């Protein structure tokens, strides 16, 4: 069946290349609206496959609109950002770009496909290339760090003090990160040193007092320090009228709020299978026969491949079906077992070459539409490769996204074909523009 999908993908690629490159610019919003309609309709689809309502069943044909919504979203946001007068530094324009990204994510989450929805965060890499402040990416990374450390080390305590290592570490990081942001974005080294000095100094003093004098939970001291830090930043906002202080204050408040809501999200918002996967990834649970089975078997398969592998179709772990999803989400473990380190490295080098080529082609576009779309394609490919390989190696959560052009499945193959070949057609049209 995969041969059929490959053949139809070649035909699709040919059709895409035959269309005028201006077609994709002209009908970007229409394509986006059509895919949003399909995503919305899929939520009410009675056909549930593997616990997901993300499939449209048309007779013998089964398609996932979420895979096609990626290129539609890329076209729509490229159209928006290439309009005259668009300025990403303006909040109204930035909010419009975010809305285009978030809207399909909402519909996809409604289909119980959280993993596919997370792919759309990759578009923020494109926004960063087009001028979005790096503080947004920093905030996202910081929240991930808070979540991991706060959940992973919630139980262990510091020495004999009734203080959680996770809570202590996260609140200390909030104080340090806030000081660093004041230094970098406000160019105010004195305020940064004041915040850092008081917070770290009092925290260390409280730690020593609790260890050698009276044991107590020093998290309360840290919370008081964070409140004082926020109050001081508010004073700077009112006194100096510098808006950067306001955003840094929001970062501090948001960090604390996010951290204390992480446990609630894990236990009450996430689905049971998602919660177990995260606990297994963080080492809080050992479920080798359940949620951790695929990852454990894929690690065995890759490790057993050695340097040169066992040979094509000679993998024992994959051939004997120890890895259930070896043709789709975990196909990289098949490469690792059969072709070894050499084959795995070769595949990763091919993806690296593709990503570097996409950067080169995107940068040479004469119009903003082509450049933005190119970086959308690049971001999606980068996210898929990083997360897919990471989850096979047990480094990232298992969220069920395919490896581009490797994993079995027609929807993903068609989706990546649309993504890449539309960009090739846009690039081919640049020479016509220059002549």
Q: What do the predicted segments below correspond to?
A:
Residues 299-302, 306-339:
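Long extracytoplasmic/lumenal interhelical loops at the membrane interface
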Residues 1-289, 333-391, 418, 422:
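Hydrophobic alpha-helical transmembrane segments of multi-pass inner membrane proteins, especially
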Residues 304, 368-373, 428-432:
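Membrane-interacting alpha-helical segments
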Residues 177-181, 394-431, 435:
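Transmembrane alpha-helices of multi-pass inner-membrane enzymes
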């Amino acid at each position: 069946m995969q041969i059929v999908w490959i053949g139809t993908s070649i035909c699709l690629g040919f059709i895409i290349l035959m269309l005028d490159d201006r077609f994709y610019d002209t009908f970007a919003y229409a394509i986006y609206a059509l895919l949003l309609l399909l995503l919305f309709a899929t939520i009410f689809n009675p056909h549930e496959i593997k616990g997901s309502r993300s499939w449209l069943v048309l007779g013998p044909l089964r398609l996932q609109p979420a895979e096609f919504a990626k290129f539609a979203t890329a076209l729509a946001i490229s159209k928006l950002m290439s309009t005259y007068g668009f300025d990403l530094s303006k909040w109204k324009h930035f909010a419009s770009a975010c809305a285009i990204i978030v809207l399909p994510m909402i519909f996809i989450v409604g289909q119980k496909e959280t993993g596919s929805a997370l792919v759309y965060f990759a578009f923020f890499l494109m926004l960063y290339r087009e001028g979005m402040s790096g503080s947004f990416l920093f905030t996202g990374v910081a929240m991930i760090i808070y979540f991991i450390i706060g959940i992973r080390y919630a139980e262990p305590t510091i020495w004999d003090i009734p203080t959680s290592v996770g809570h202590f570490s996260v609140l200390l990081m909030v104080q340090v990160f806030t000081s660093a942001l004041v230094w970098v974005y406000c160019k105010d080294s004195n305020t940064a040193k004041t915040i850092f000095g008081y917070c770290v100094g009092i925290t260390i003093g409280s730690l020593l007092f609790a260890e050698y004098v009276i044991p107590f939970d020093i998290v309360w001291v840290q919370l008081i320090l964070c409140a004082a830090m926020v109050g001081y930043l508010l004073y700077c906002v009112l006194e100096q009228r510098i808006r950067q202080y306001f955003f840094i204050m929001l970062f501090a408040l948001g960090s604390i709020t996010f951290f204390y809501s992480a446990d609630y999200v894990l236990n009450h918002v996430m689905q049971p299978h998602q919660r177990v996967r995260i606990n297994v990834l963080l080492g809080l649970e050992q479920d080798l026969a359940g949620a951790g089975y695929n990852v454990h078997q894929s690690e065995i398969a890759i490790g057993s491949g050695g340097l040169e592998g066992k040979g094509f179709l000679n993998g024992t772990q994959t051939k004997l079906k120890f890895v259930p999803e070896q043709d789709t989400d975990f196909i990289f473990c098949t490469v690792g077992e059969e072709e070894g380190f050499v084959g795995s490295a070769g595949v990763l080098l091919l993806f690296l070459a593709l990503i570097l080529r996409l950067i080169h082609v995107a940068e040479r576009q004469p119009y903003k539409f082509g450049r933005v779309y190119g970086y959308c394609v690049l971001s999606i490919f980068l996210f898929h490769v990083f997360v897919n390989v990471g989850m096979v190696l047990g480094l990232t959560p298992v969220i069920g996204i395919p490896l581009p052009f490797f994993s079995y499945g027609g929807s993903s193959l068609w989706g990546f074909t649309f993504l890449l070949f539309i960009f090739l057609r846009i690039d081919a049209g640049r020479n016509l523009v220059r002549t």
